[in-house]
Structure formats: structure tokens, C-alpha cells
């Protein structure tokens, strides 16, 4: 076997090993990486329960809602700001309702007659 044939064989072997390594790794490349990197968030747990507040759940920053209504801007409701610091979004418990609010129309019934989205709440007949 000639010297150039041996070098060609080694080069082919190295290329095959690199290809095998590339195919067996679970690397994320520029186009398919999640925002925080491949180890950032497990896709099975994209949502978690929202924080609880004085008498219900946090439905947005400074908004606490429960069976007897909603509090906005109170000391207890201001605890809900902490929810925004968590990179994993929370899932508000309640029946879905639609608002006429541009860009953010899908909300949840959080109290009797009240529908909320991330930053606002309104009276909604579908939540009775």
C-alpha cells in the first residue's frame, strides 16, 4: 500500500468518526436551541401553577384573585410581582374566557364574573 493511500484511508476514517460523533450528540445548533440553551427548561414542564396570595392566586403583577373577587395594588397583591421574576410561566387556574383586548385576548375566569389576562381584568358575563 502506498503512503498516499494510507493517508487517504486515515482521512476517511477520521471523517467517518466525526460524522458519527456529530450524529450521536444531542447538541443544539443555532436554529434549534431554546432561549436559555439546551439545558434551560425541560419541555414537559413549560407551565407551573401560579403563586398563591392572600385569598386566591396571582393572575398578573400586582393582581390577586380568588372566590370573593380581586385585589389590585394592595400589599398582598404586590407579592405577585415575584411571579414575573420566574422564567417559567405560570398557568392560571380557571375556565377560559375571551376579551376584546388587542394582542392579549385569551384570559381565564378567576372570580365570579371576572376575566383576567396577564395585565388586566374585566367584568365578563361568561365567567358567571
From Swiss-Prot:
Q: Which UniProt keywords apply?
A: Amidation, Disulfide bond, G-protein coupled receptor impairing toxin, Secreted, Signal, Toxin
The cellular location(s) given in this protein's UniProt record come to: Secreted
* Primary subcellular site in the record, as a coarse category: secreted
Tell me if Signal is a UniProt keyword of this record. Answer: yes
Q: Which SUPFAM superfamilies match?
A: Neurophysin II
Q: Which GO terms describe its cellular component?
A: extracellular space; secretory granule
Which residues does this entry mark as bearing Glycine amide?
A: 36
Could you say which residues form the signal peptide? Answer: 1-27
Q: Give the molecular function GO annotations.
A: neurohypophyseal hormone activity; toxin activity
Q: Which Gene3D superfamilies match?
A: Neurohypophysial hormone domain
Taken from the UniProt record, the cysteine pairs bridged by disulfide bonds within this chain are 28-33, 50-90, 53-64, 58-80, 65-70, 97-115, 109-127, 116-121
Q: In which tissues is it expressed?
A: Expressed by the venom gland.
Q: Which residues form the propeptide?
A: 37-44
Q: What family is reported?
A: Belongs to the vasopressin/oxytocin family.
Q: What is known of its domains?
A: The cysteine framework of the conopressin is C-C.
| Name of the protein in its database record | Conopressin-conophysin
| Organism of provenance | Conus geographus
